[in-house]
Amino acid sequence: MEDNRKRNMERRRETSRHAARDRRSKESDIFDDLKMCVPIVEEGTVTHLDRIALLRVAATICRLRKTAGNVLENNLDNEITNEVWTEDTIAECLDGFVMIVDSDSSILYVTESVAMYLGLTQTDLTGRALRDFLHPSDYDEFDKQSKMLHKPRGEDTDTTGINMVLRMKTVISPRGRCLNLKSALYKSVSFLVHSKVSTGGHVSFMQGITIPAGQGTTNANASAMTKYTESPMGAFTTRHTCDMRITFVSDKFNYILKSELKTLMGTSFYELVHPADMMIVSKSMKELFAKGHIRTPYYRLIAANDTLAWIQTEATTITHTTKGQKGQYVICVHYVLGIQGAEESLVVCTDSMPAGMQVDIKKEVDDTRDYIGRQPEIVECVDFTPLIEPEDPFDTVIEPVVGGEEPVKQADMGARKNSYDDVLQWLFRDQPSSPPPARYRSADRFRTTEPSNFGSALASPDFMDSSSRTSRPKTSYGRRAQSQGSRTTGSSSTSASATLPHSANYSPLAEGISQCGLNSPPSIKSGQVVYGDARSMGRSCDPSDSSRRFSALSPSDTLNVSSTRGINPVIGSNDVFSTMPFADSIAIAERIDSSPTLTSGEPILCDDLQWEEPDLSCLAPFVDTYDMMQMDEGLPPELQALYDLPDFTPAVPQAPAARPVHIDRSPPAKRMHQSGPSDLDFMYTQHYQPFQQDETYWQGQQQQNEQQPSSYSPFPMLS
């Protein structure tokens, strides 16, 4: 008996196991069939699906067909087979995601793209309550706003909907880490909510727009928007304080609103908003400071020429800490839909033109009238022209004395100033309507009248070529002359009827150089020059005569200073080393009463005045850093040796300091005796011991000059 009972129990257990196995197999087949019927569980975002979630999704699909059946299009038999308008392509082009929520806040449907923005899949949201994924304070606002949209059947519903910002849970951190649903973060999502009446109640259609998940923090995304939204796609960036005063405006803002004539810095952003859209913008700004991020509905900004710009703004609040104090500002990215006239924006909405928008998108303001008749203008952006030109010791001009009166300083208002005194005089003048200094470099602005030679006048005080600085090409300065060979020209006498025009700018440097008596080298025979500028030499000096020479003035003549007033100095265009007569310095010293040694009543014998030759080694051609060229093997030995010196740095040339030989060393018969001691005599008495044998020295000096070779080198330190 006992054995039969055990045998029956084993048979029953085996039968029960087979029944349970068969039951589980049938349940699995049923769930497999149900899974095949539910469309959303076959998406790629579904990683794991339990049977409870499958039943929840299946029940939600059945509820969706019942509740939203009359508000959704069910007849898909006549669907156009064009792949461009399929459901998949439209969902991919959609910005954000779409949810369908029942009146009891149950999520009936959500698009697959929700996983990109919140990290939650369709199966995680479908069939569950929206309350579980919203911030508690935001759900109360959503419930209140959705009830305002619910209207009885037969009444006209609001086709535009309402905009609100709701904070939803996200399971992806800003750095891309996956989180648990219990430790999820809240993220601001801008929703556009529509409500429709269904058989089972009201159904809400919600479109959510936000930043994709795992793309960084809100501050980082706002900074990225500031940098990368300056594109020609109709978007521009502004930055505001907490009271919406503009602190930064992009260039696109001036292009769209045509506000380049009026600065917008410091003005309120509300001044640009159309009065009819002020309530929309103010409500969006309140939500911005409460939730940190918004996307406004479409509104209008007042533009120039009686036009309106349709704008949609995405704003973000940025919190920063500066010097221990927390601050906050707003970054707005404005997307421009188009520009239309003020009267056109008041047109009643129709089916062909929804929301009162213009038909022609991105219509620009016609600004052709602003550019008719204007010629192209080339603006120098690299070469900056200073306000005053650098003082060149080679281009000095002495103002002529006309009619025994002092010349009047009349600087050309359109010319560039040659000294800081002229600049200060121009800045503090009593004529505010006078034109400012010239903007571009032009030789015509500095040229007055072509200088003419005066045969019987005094010699030119210029040390180098006395032609106008602007008459020489700028590009040849500081570069080696390309032409080789002798550059000698004969002396020429000019007519005495020509007059020199007034110099517009009086140079104190020229006065100082003329007083110092900067002389011409007495040992020049040929015009061979190894300087950078290809300028011809002046008169050739006889090596046998080392005396001081004057152009157009014989050595045996005497010059009375009192009779030189009113005579114009000659500025020869071919003089390179033109002499600087002592008479010019006397005339200037008499005019300004600054000559310490000479008086105006003495005649001067100037054929045998001895002057010490200045050191011309400092007059090597100046080479700018940008004009440096590779030295070739064809350079003269002097230049090649000069550029081979170690630590050679080009520098701006300076005028050599000419020093006259002490007056006691000149021949006794031709000394200029003063009536009393002067400052110059005192200086040479303290620092210079004259030779005692003056007669013997001058006799030997004359013989030595006759025997010395007639070659001259501008670099005495290398010769």
UniProtKB/Swiss-Prot annotation:
GO terms for biological process: apoptotic process; cellular response to caloric restriction; cellular response to hypoxia; determination of adult lifespan; heat acclimation; negative regulation of apoptotic process; phosphorelay signal transduction system; positive regulation of transcription by RNA polymerase II. Expressed in all somatic cells. It comes from the Eukaryota. Residues 465-474 have a biased composition (Polar residues). Disruption phenotype: Displays developmental defect, exhibiting slower larval growth. Exhibits intolerance to hypoxia in nhr-49 mutant background, with less than 2% animal surviving to L4 larval stage. 66% do not survive embryogenesis when cultured in hypoxic conditions of 1% oxygen. Able to survive anoxic conditions. Inefficient translocation of aha-1 to the nucleus. Inability to acclimate to heat. Partial resistance to paralysis and killing by enteropathogenic E.coli and P.aeruginosa. Extends lifespan in a temperature dependent manner but not when grown with a restricted diet. The keyword Nucleus applies. Coiled coil: none annotated. Residues 296-340 form the PAC domain. GO terms for molecular function: DNA-binding transcription factor activity; DNA-binding transcription factor activity, RNA polymerase II-specific; protein dimerization activity; RNA polymerase II transcription regulatory region sequence-specific DNA binding; RNA polymerase II-specific DNA-binding transcription factor binding. A transcription factor which is a key regulator in various cellular processes; including environment stress resistance (oxygen levels, hydrogen sulfide and cyanide levels and heat), negative regulation of cell apoptosis in ASJ neurons by inhibition of cep-1 via transcriptional activation of tyr-2, resistance/susceptibility to pathogenic bacteria, lifespan and brood size. Involved in mediating susceptibility to enteropathogenic E.coli. Increased levels of hif-1 activity confer resistance to P.aeruginosa-mediated death but also confer susceptibility to S.aureus infection. Binds to aha-1. Interacts (hydroxylated on Pro-621) with vhl-1; the interaction induces hif-1 degradation. This is Hypoxia-inducible factor 1. It comes from Caenorhabditis elegans. The gene is hif-1.
